[in-house]
Swiss-Prot record:
Subunit annotation: Interacts with the large mitochondrial ribosomal subunit.
Species classification: Eukaryota, Metazoa, Chordata, Craniata, Vertebrata
An annotated GO cellular component: cytoplasm
Family listed: Belongs to the peroxisomal membrane protein PXMP2/4 family.
Protein name: Mpv17-like protein 2
Organism encoding this protein: Homo sapiens (Human)
GO terms assigned for molecular function: mitochondrial large ribosomal subunit binding
């Protein structure tokens, strides 16, 4: 039994390695991005359901997140390949190029993906272009500031230590919390503005 179990485990690991080679890697990265984005939305919806009695799970919302995530997967796949070609780096000797990769990633890919996220979801959910652009203007800088707080350190580790074929998978592994935040940013309820007169009345009532 023990020997048979080890053989099955080795076969399973060998089969898993195929997912990170050749054309299969593109599929793995694409589906991984979609699945993690949908999972992040699922986590966020679970929190909302607990906080707001009567709210039910919205599968269409998670499906939209999955679709947008899958659309980003090929871009990320080829983006990292391009960065490796432009700024080859191996170990600590490649430290200057690693810093260049992180900077280029933050200045180019991060804002592009932010625009992609809000406009893509807006399109899937029936928003007009004007509505999507208005939402982008309202939320983009909050997204981008949070991105700078999270991803430079993560990408530094990614470019310095993670083998190229595992880079998108590494990011996907870290991204569940980030995708939960993106779902919150996209779907949070707007805070109603209270007229000044109402504030004054409330204050007097206290």
């Amino acid at each position: 039994m023990a020997r048979g179990g080890w053989r099955r485990l080795r076969r399973l690991l060998s089969a898993g390695q195929l997912l990170f080679q050749g054309r299969a890697l593109l599929v793995t990265n694409t589906l991984g991005c979609g699945a993690l984005m949908a999972a992040g939305d699922g986590v966020r919806q679970s929190w909302e359901i607990r906080a707001r009695p009567g709210q039910v799970f919205d599968p269409r919302r998670s499906a939209s997140m999955f679709a947008v995530g899958c659309s980003m997967g090929p871009f990320l796949h080829y983006w990292y390949l391009s960065l490796d070609r432009l700024f080859p780096a191996s170990g600590l000797r490649g430290f200057p190029n690693v810093l260049k990769k992180v900077l280029v990633d933050q200045l180019v890919a991060s804002p592009l993906l932010g625009v992609w996220y809000f406009l893509g979801l807006g399109c899937l959910e029936g928003q007009t272009v004007g509505e999507s652009c208005q939402e982008l203007r309202e939320k983009f800088w909050e997204f981008y500031k949070a991105d700078w707080c999270v991803w430079p350190a993560a990408q530094f580790v990614n470019f310095l230590f993670v083998p190229p074929q595992f880079r998108v998978t590494y990011i996907n592994g870290l991204t569940l919390g980030w995708d939960t935040y993106l779902s919150y940013l996209k779907y949070r309820s707007p805070v109603p503005l209270t007229p000044p007169g109402c504030v004054a009345l409330d204050t007097r009532a206290d």
